[in-house]
């Protein structure tokens, strides 16, 4: 056994000794708040259960939410139901329980948390990501669906780069997630990021014609964008090489939009599409 393992074992034995033999002689509240972080560090759920059984006040906000969401279910539920427990509190890393559960892929924890009416579902972490942003980045349609069912969810929330949930969904290439977002009445399909690009730009840049068509068919798509990009898609798919086709092949999405707009303002009948 190495020195580090020996120290770990000694600390663990000391905690057990305190709980078994000295608990009646000390301030149990202060004890609990000291032991809880140590027990979580050593992943000793049995010690935490002893604190629970002895009805010792042990909860401490010093423990990261990513640790809390990985507790066994009985411990997690015990903590959540404590009067002093704030379900929306951020840890030192800026993560709420919801952020942490999504990051860890804990769909059952997300389901449990979204059953609370006071859950703040749009809180951003230090990176500017809402829980819905994280679920989309994680490519997890199950959790995305849970979040979308929550009453106050904001599907147009932006991160620090100006990306909406739809911008992120386009990058995920997950059709199911994109479809779920496009079905939302309040979704803004024309919102621009900090670079001035819409989700449609992203789909064109990524060469995802099937996603481009999904966006173009949306009832709220900006008419100007719809006309320009529909015009470009026709030229891109046409086997005959036309001036428009060549332009779309050579230029990037941003330049292609400008190129398409200039052509669109001319008499398109002069080109064989």
Curated annotation (Swiss-Prot):
The keyword Repeat applies. It holds the Pfam family Ank_2. SMART domains: ANK. ANK repeats lie at residues 31-60, 93-123, 127-157, 161-191, 195-225. InterPro entries: Ankyrin_rpt (IPR002110), Ankyrin_rpt-contain_sf (IPR036770), Multifunctional_regulatory (IPR050745). Keywords: ANK repeat, Repeat. SUPFAM superfamilies: Ankyrin repeat. Gene3D superfamilies: Ankyrin repeat-containing domain. This is Putative ankyrin repeat protein RBE_0317. It comes from Rickettsia bellii (strain RML369-C).
């Amino acid at each position: 056994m190495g020195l580090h393992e020996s120290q770990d074992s000694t600390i663990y034995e000391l905690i057990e000794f305190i709980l078994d033999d000295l608990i009646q002689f000390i301030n149990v509240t202060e004890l609990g708040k000291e032991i809880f972080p140590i027990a979580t560090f050593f992943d000793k759920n049995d010690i935490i259960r002893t604190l629970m059984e002895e009805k010792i006040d042990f909860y401490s906000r010093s423990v990261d939410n990513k640790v809390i969401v990985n507790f066994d279910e009985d411990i997690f539920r015990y903590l959540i139901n404590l009067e002093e427990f704030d379900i929306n509190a951020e840890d030192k890393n800026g993560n709420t329980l919801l952020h942490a559960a999504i990051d860890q892929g804990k769909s059952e924890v997300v389901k449990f948390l979204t059953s609370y009416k006071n859950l703040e579902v749009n809180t951003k972490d230090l990176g500017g990501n809402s829980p819905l942003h994280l679920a989309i980045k994680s490519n997890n349609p199950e959790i995305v669906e849970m979040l979308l069912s929550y009453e106050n969810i904001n599907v147009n929330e932006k991160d620090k780069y100006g990306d909406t949930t739809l911008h992120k969904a386009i990058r995920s290439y997950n059709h199911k997630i994109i479809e779920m977002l496009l079905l939302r009445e309040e979704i803004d399909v024309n919102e621009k990021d900090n670079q001035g690009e819409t989700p449609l730009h992203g789909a064109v840049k990524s060469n995802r014609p099937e996603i481009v068509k999904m966006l173009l068919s949306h009832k709220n798509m900006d008419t100007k964008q719809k006309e320009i990009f529909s015009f470009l898609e026709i030229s891109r798919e046409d086997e005959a090489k036309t001036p428009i086709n060549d332009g779309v092949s050579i230029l990037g999405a941003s330049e292609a939009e400008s190129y398409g707009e200039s052509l669109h303002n001319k008499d398109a009948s002069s080109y064989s599409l």
